[in-house]
Amino acid sequence: MKVSSLLPSVLLLVGATRASPHPAQPPQQQPLNNIIEESNTQTNPPNKHDLEHVIDTSPLLSLHRDLVKFESISGNEADVGDFLIQYLQARDFKVEKQIVVPKGPKGQGERFNIYAYPNSTPEPRVLLSSHMDTVPPYIPYSLDLPSSNGSTTDSLNWRDNILIAGRGSVDAKASVASQILAVLEYLQLHPEAPLGLLFVVGEEVDGIGMQYFSQSELNTSPPTVHTVIFGEPTELALVSGHKGSLFFKISAKGKAAHSGYPWLGQSAVSALLPALVKLDTLADIPVEDGGIPGSEKLGKSTINIGRIDAGIASNVVPASAEASVNIRLAYHDVEKVKEIVTKAVDEATNGDENVTIEWGNKGKGHAPIDFDTDVDGFKVMTVNYATDAWYLKFHEGSGGSPEGRVHTYLYGPGSIFVAHGADEAITVRDLEDAVSGYKKLIEAAFERNKV
């Protein structure tokens, strides 16, 4: 590729992006198309500079890069949040910084949501939302190209297959970046479109950001929005529903003693083990035998004993033991599942009062949640993971929708199978296809709610 032949177009693209804060100039994206076409026709093997050039010359890919380079593990979202505020304000957005956790005495620890909309349209009707936080550990941003099998197709389409890795590259900074670009590009053609963006903290832990937003004045009563599009890794499919979630801790108390004389003590581990063995089977045994129900739509409920802590040393009879358990619920009745768990533990331990259950999330748990899938042209699937969409509780009212309810969608680039893993990564094509997908959902929402 001849860089010199691209330089005027690149300078035009960069200049247009920086010089005008409002994205009202449709021509500014045209040079990017030329760059894409020329990049995809290069026959020489691309080098590191070629990969970086693709990122640098794309508003979408460079924004995604900038986001992933921030370490924003849950609780540490402030830096990436400040960056997003500046980015959106420079593009003529009104940004409301919603403080969720205030700064500490030394100015540390501030956590905030970002609620943004064009200055020209202060009441969004369509809201796109995702989260700024990631799971640990931080993995630096990097670029790579999957090995080619030597085919002509591979050599021509190398740009689409560039692999962008790093923590959050999929979950969920891919959604954040593609949602922003979708909104900017839609506004270029429809400058008065009432669109909004909501980026929250804490989705990966406790949903604190969405809970705070849901209880705030920004979640208006009655709703002003008629559509909310949540961004998570769905492999560019519309999700018709995801499982609920129930966390709990099961603990046992014992009495410490020398391991050479275990009869002088009481092992908390021995008390806990029968309960864990029973719990481990609850999603696999028939309901009539005390198992946890599933559903036709979401399949089986699943149970995971994710952490066990006990004792202080191998030569001491353990005086305490506990396990953390998570059930992914395909069944709608959370209270019924809690009854099933309680009964199973009681039967397995013969009613041992030293074994107790502590329900997480203030004992509430989350039932499965459904989403809309009424837009043509998308694959439709269900997922086993949960999102913070459960926490967004709409007030009574139609949100301007003739159907009398707020429509919700779950969609985004990347695969959940690599999210949270050491190999978290996404391709250029997935990111760019997501922008088109989000714009299609936006357009369908406005078409559906035409008066």
From Swiss-Prot:
| Cofactor binding, per record | Binds 2 Zn(2+) ions per subunit.
Carbohydrate-modified residues are 149, 354
The catalytic residues are: 203
Where is the signal peptide, in residue numbers?
A: 1-19
- Single GO cellular component term: extracellular region
Q: Which GO terms describe its biological process?
A: proteolysis
Protein's cellular compartments? Secreted
InterPro entries from the UniProt entry: ArgE/DapE_CS (IPR001261), Bact_exopeptidase_dim_dom (IPR036264), Peptidase_M20 (IPR002933), Peptidase_M20_dimer (IPR011650), Peptidase_M20A (IPR050072)
State if Hydrolase is listed as a keyword: yes
Keywords (alphabetical) are: Glycoprotein, Hydrolase, Metal-binding, Protease, Secreted, Signal, Zinc
Q: Where does Zn(2+) 1 bind?
A: 171, 204
Identify the CDD domains for this entry. M20_ArgE_DapE-like_fungal (cd05652)
Top EC class per UniProt?
Answer: hydrolase
List the GO molecular function terms.
Answer: metal ion binding; peptidase activity
Residues annotated as coiled-coil are: none
Q: Which residues bind Zn(2+) 2?
A: 171
| SUPFAM superfamilies in alphabetical order | Bacterial exopeptidase dimerisation domain, Zn-dependent exopeptidases
Q: Per its Swiss-Prot or TrEMBL entry, what cofactor is needed?
A: Zn(2+)
Q: Give the EC number(s) under which this enzyme is classified.
A: 3.4.17.-
Q: Which family does it belong to?
A: Belongs to the peptidase M20A family.
Recorded protein name is Probable carboxypeptidase PMAA_093910
Origin organism is Talaromyces marneffei (strain ATCC 18224 / CBS 334.59 / QM 7333) (Penicillium marneffei)
